[in-house]
């Protein structure tokens, strides 16, 4: 499981012109599930998202988590995080989990984040989304579930 975490001033997802999810200051997280990922990966990734200290404290040091600052989280499913571009000119997505499994795992990440008391908005699974992200910093980090070590 992979999560691309971005610190943002705001984020928003629209599908066919209608807003399906939006947040103020916090994190936009693109989440992809890979072959062989499971519930333990979802829990691990959610714990990292909730507790990574990537927001500044009074001294300007990254010392606070999204939970600490009262930020929100926008989770967007993103199978292209498993795109393999090593051969040819078209990415291969064979390492991405099948859609039903990916949906279950992305929903598990969202559920775990909510258990941590976070306000979580989401995109729409398997839809063509327009994602607006106003990065802050920018701060962008990749987290991989323990099963996805590569």
Curated annotation (Swiss-Prot):
Q: HAMAP family of this UniProt entry? A: Deacylase_Dtd
List, alphabetically, the InterPro entries matched: Daa-tRNA_deacyls_DTD, DTD-like_sf
Where does the record place it?
Cytoplasm
> Top-down, what is the taxonomic lineage of the species of origin?
Bacteria, Bacillati, Bacillota, Clostridia, Eubacteriales
**Which EC number(s) does UniProt give?**
3.1.1.96
| Presence of keyword Coiled coil | no
What organism is recorded for this protein? Heliobacterium modesticaldum (strain ATCC 51547 / Ice1)
Reaction(s) catalysed (UniProt annotation)? glycyl-tRNA(Ala) + H2O = tRNA(Ala) + glycine + H(+); a D-aminoacyl-tRNA + H2O = a tRNA + a D-alpha-amino acid + H(+)
What is the protein name stated in its UniProt record?
A: D-aminoacyl-tRNA deacylase
